[in-house]
């Protein structure tokens, strides 16, 4: 056949990506996770209202960045392992969940595009945050940020984060941080979703663009 010949294997795959802004922050009563909601395929916005905050156990949640398919699959596998762990040993700790994430990400690091933040609450350790970047290492931190939009807010977060903030202060901190990430990062946008984990249980919050764009 005459005409232009194209090597399909050399074309970039149109993988759906959570090019994103995610974070989790400990505060005096627990921990709060936050994320934007834009999903992209290259320069195309595939979904404006994606939920990047995923439950893996009652009070253990994760923020997902990287390949949407990879991170959804990992979260599903971790949820299965934690349910199995619960039936044998009782309620898992946040550290246990982070270890399962780390094992999966490290063992498959050459095949996955996944950056995960794991956060949870239990009566013994209270609120905890673990970040698992590309490659599968794990780091416990008082707060963590990740995704393409995080590049723009490292300075802001470092200056404004304080330990033992109140719930209201922490929600405000996350809202301000993610609003700046969304402002400067083309792969971040949509609504800001949050999950609050405390002794009282799980609370979900959502903030629309008209509530944060003027910050």
Curated annotation (Swiss-Prot):
It is found in: Cytoplasm; Nucleus. Keywords: Acetylation, Cytoplasm, Hydrolase, Nucleus, Protease, Proteasome, Threonine protease, Zymogen. The modification N-acetylmethionine is found at residue 1. GO terms for cellular component: cytosol; nucleus; proteasome complex; proteasome core complex, beta-subunit complex; proteasome storage granule. Belongs to the peptidase T1B family. GO terms for molecular function: endopeptidase activity; threonine-type endopeptidase activity. It comes from Saccharomyces cerevisiae (strain ATCC 204508 / S288c). InterPro entries: Ntn_hydrolases_N, Pept_T1A_subB, Proteasome_bsu_CS, Proteasome_sua/b, Proteasome_suB-type. The active site is at 20 (nucleophile). The gene is PRE3. Its main location: cytoplasm. This is Proteasome subunit beta type-1.
